[in-house]
From Swiss-Prot:
SUPFAM superfamilies: Translational machinery components
Stated family: Belongs to the universal ribosomal protein uS11 family.
Pfam family membership, one: Ribosomal_S11
Disulfide cross-links: none
Gene3D superfamilies: Ribosomal protein S11 (3.30.420.80)
Protein name: Small ribosomal subunit protein uS11
Positions of region (Disordered): 102-124
Subunit-level organization: Part of the 30S ribosomal subunit. Interacts with proteins S7 and S18. Binds to IF-3.
Single Gene Ontology MF annotation: structural constituent of ribosome
Organism superkingdom: Bacteria
InterPro entries: Ribosomal_uS11, Ribosomal_uS11_bac-type, Ribosomal_uS11_CS, Ribosomal_uS11_sf
Free-text function comment from the UniProt entry: Located on the platform of the 30S subunit, it bridges several disparate RNA helices of the 16S rRNA. Forms part of the Shine-Dalgarno cleft in the 70S ribosome.
GO CC terms, sorted: ribonucleoprotein complex; ribosome
Length: 124
């Protein structure tokens, strides 16, 4: 049986997807292949605790530990979503000692697309 060789990824992309209910942090190579990920739910939080910024920070730290095993040194951060944990997750990655190439907000915004649900219309 052949010995499994661990992939080395010196440069990567950190994707932070923050929703009102959860925060998902994943690390991919430059082609987009995910090699490490974590989320607020995956680290053990359930229900309303998943959406807290503290849980998002722990999810980012857990994903960072997995990503550092692959030799990650330089990262671009892509933030998507409107949840409360996106800033905390970003700060956790910035404080980790990795070289940050760029921080970009890639939240999709409609150019007057479909009609939003009733609860969002009430807020407007």
């Amino acid at each position: 049986m052949a010995k499994k060789v661990k992939k080395v990824v010196p440069q990567g992309i950190a994707h932070i997807h923050s929703t009102y209910q959860n925060t998902i942090v994943s690390f991919s190579d430059l082609k987009g292949n995910v090699f490490a990920w974590s989320s607020s739910g995956a680290i053990g939080y359930k229900g309303t605790k998943k959406k807290t910024p503290y849980a998002a920070g722990l999810a980012a730290a857990a994903a960072l530990e997995k990503a550092k095993e692959f030799g990650l040194k330089e990262v671009s951060i892509l933030v998507k979503g409107v949840g409360p944990g996106k800033a905390t997750a970003r700060k956790q990655i910035e404080a980790s000692g990795l070289t940050i190439k760029e921080v970009k907000d890639v939240t999709p915004t409609p150019h007057n697309g479909t009609r939003p649900p009733k609860k969002i219309l009430k807020r407007m």
